[in-house]
């Protein structure tokens, strides 16, 4: 039998990428509101460009937030602290344009006391469909390409902040990983792309010489630390700063907006996406909370050994608590003779996907040991400190199919 062979690519961007600067500011604002008022309704969007930050959106809360202070703190933490970056935490303008949320939306979302079941009182914040996914490619049950891409830029940021080596690094960077699959299994890494912002070349060194130093450093200190050696071979291609000089970057190089990196935030294109961004949205917005819950369902199904891959879709109507539909697809990888229909039937009984049930299960209104800002760079999934990554439903799923 001939082997199937194909290539698949995913990308990531660092915390210093302009869109991620926006995401982190929006989520830091959300963190501040929720810490004061767990019932806050927040839809916060951020725009960043040369020397300027604009924070806007709709809020219903009893909390009081200092937008200037939050934005400057986040920008400082990321590393934009020098005037030469043309986007500096200490000198950039910060404009707040937050205002009250629509009463029409509040009416459908907030608790209806006449309904007996508390979880039926809180409706979905909007209509839409959300997806979750899990697979056996990595220990985190995430697709391999996006996991490696996330780790590359995360390690770059850690090296930059440590300040011991590669001291020329600036905050903005991107990564991309292409994997070769044989018979649906990761066989090797075919290509790695890393573009990182950097200081001007040192005196007495040409641009070509400096780029050669950067290339060597990134391969040795980043790629070889992230990508398993057995996946790299003589034919693996490394594209390091392929356009050459990358001094101008961050919000000075490109305008940043909240919610523009939804594939980076999720599965790197390995799974469908409902289209709704996460950052800046409180957990009553099912764009966020139901995507987290869908990942939780998919991951537990795979962790329970019911399938090697699992896609979960859930959809909602605004103001209605119970999902309009739930769909589970194991991509012909279901085990123990199970069908997708059988898995879905049990999953619907085990996982409550009403918005308030999701919020309570993961404590999304009172985060402990994690923050929304933390989710806003390097992916919302495949990171074990987030509660939706727990696999506490594995035994219950196994028992449902007499596999325990």
UniProtKB/Swiss-Prot annotation:
<feature type="binding site">
    <location>
        <position position="45"/>
    </location>
    <ligand>
        <name>K(+)</name>
    </ligand>
</feature>
<feature type="binding site" description="in other chain">
    <location>
        <position position="101"/>
    </location>
    <ligand>
        <name>L-methionine</name>
    </ligand>
</feature>
<dbReference type="GO" id="GO:0006730">
    <property type="term" value="P:one-carbon metabolic process"/>
</dbReference>
<feature type="binding site">
    <location>
        <position position="277"/>
    </location>
    <ligand>
        <name>ATP</name>
    </ligand>
</feature>
<dbReference type="GO" id="GO:0006556">
    <property type="term" value="P:S-adenosylmethionine biosynthetic process"/>
</dbReference>
<dbReference type="Pfam" id="PF00438">
    <property type="entry name" value="S-AdoMet_synt_N"/>
</dbReference>
<comment type="subunit">
    <text>Homotetramer; dimer of dimers.</text>
</comment>
<feature type="binding site" description="in other chain">
    <location>
        <begin position="260"/>
        <end position="261"/>
    </location>
    <ligand>
        <name>ATP</name>
    </ligand>
</feature>
<keyword id="KW-0547">Nucleotide-binding</keyword>
<keyword id="KW-0808">Transferase</keyword>
<dbReference type="GO" id="GO:0005524">
    <property type="term" value="F:ATP binding"/>
</dbReference>
<dbReference type="Pfam" id="PF02773">
    <property type="entry name" value="S-AdoMet_synt_C"/>
</dbReference>
<feature type="binding site" description="in other chain">
    <location>
        <position position="285"/>
    </location>
    <ligand>
        <name>L-methionine</name>
    </ligand>
</feature>
<dbReference type="InterPro" id="IPR022629">
    <property type="entry name" value="S-AdoMet_synt_central"/>
</dbReference>
<keyword id="KW-0630">Potassium</keyword>
<feature type="compositionally biased region" description="Polar residues">
    <location>
        <begin position="1"/>
        <end position="13"/>
    </location>
</feature>
<feature type="binding site" description="in other chain">
    <location>
        <begin position="172"/>
        <end position="174"/>
    </location>
    <ligand>
        <name>ATP</name>
    </ligand>
</feature>
<comment type="function">
    <text>Catalyzes the formation of S-adenosylmethionine (AdoMet) from methionine and ATP. The overall synthetic reaction is composed of two sequential steps, AdoMet formation and the subsequent tripolyphosphate hydrolysis which occurs prior to release of AdoMet from the enzyme.</text>
</comment>
<protein>
    <recommendedName>
        <fullName>S-adenosylmethionine synthase</fullName>
        <ecNumber>2.5.1.6</ecNumber>
    </recommendedName>
</protein>
<feature type="binding site">
    <location>
        <position position="19"/>
    </location>
    <ligand>
        <name>Mg(2+)</name>
    </ligand>
</feature>
<keyword id="KW-0460">Magnesium</keyword>
<dbReference type="GO" id="GO:0000287">
    <property type="term" value="F:magnesium ion binding"/>
</dbReference>
<dbReference type="GO" id="GO:0004478">
    <property type="term" value="F:methionine adenosyltransferase activity"/>
</dbReference>
<dbReference type="InterPro" id="IPR002133">
    <property type="entry name" value="S-AdoMet_synthetase"/>
</dbReference>
<feature type="binding site">
    <location>
        <position position="254"/>
    </location>
    <ligand>
        <name>ATP</name>
    </ligand>
</feature>
<keyword id="KW-0479">Metal-binding</keyword>
<dbReference type="InterPro" id="IPR022628">
    <property type="entry name" value="S-AdoMet_synt_N"/>
</dbReference>
<feature type="region of interest" description="Flexible loop">
    <location>
        <begin position="101"/>
        <end position="111"/>
    </location>
</feature>
<comment type="similarity">
    <text>Belongs to the AdoMet synthase family.</text>
</comment>
<keyword id="KW-0963">Cytoplasm</keyword>
<comment type="pathway">
    <text>Amino-acid biosynthesis; S-adenosyl-L-methionine biosynthesis; S-adenosyl-L-methionine from L-methionine: step 1/1.</text>
</comment>
<keyword id="KW-0554">One-carbon metabolism</keyword>
<feature type="region of interest" description="Disordered">
    <location>
        <begin position="1"/>
        <end position="20"/>
    </location>
</feature>
<feature type="binding site" description="in other chain">
    <location>
        <position position="58"/>
    </location>
    <ligand>
        <name>L-methionine</name>
    </ligand>
</feature>
<feature type="binding site" description="in other chain">
    <location>
        <position position="17"/>
    </location>
    <ligand>
        <name>ATP</name>
    </ligand>
</feature>
<keyword id="KW-0067">ATP-binding</keyword>
<dbReference type="InterPro" id="IPR022630">
    <property type="entry name" value="S-AdoMet_synt_C"/>
</dbReference>
<feature type="binding site" description="in other chain">
    <location>
        <begin position="245"/>
        <end position="246"/>
    </location>
    <ligand>
        <name>ATP</name>
    </ligand>
</feature>
<dbReference type="GO" id="GO:0005737">
    <property type="term" value="C:cytoplasm"/>
</dbReference>
<dbReference type="InterPro" id="IPR022636">
    <property type="entry name" value="S-AdoMet_synthetase_sfam"/>
</dbReference>
<feature type="binding site">
    <location>
        <position position="254"/>
    </location>
    <ligand>
        <name>L-methionine</name>
    </ligand>
</feature>
<feature type="binding site">
    <location>
        <position position="281"/>
    </location>
    <ligand>
        <name>ATP</name>
    </ligand>
</feature>
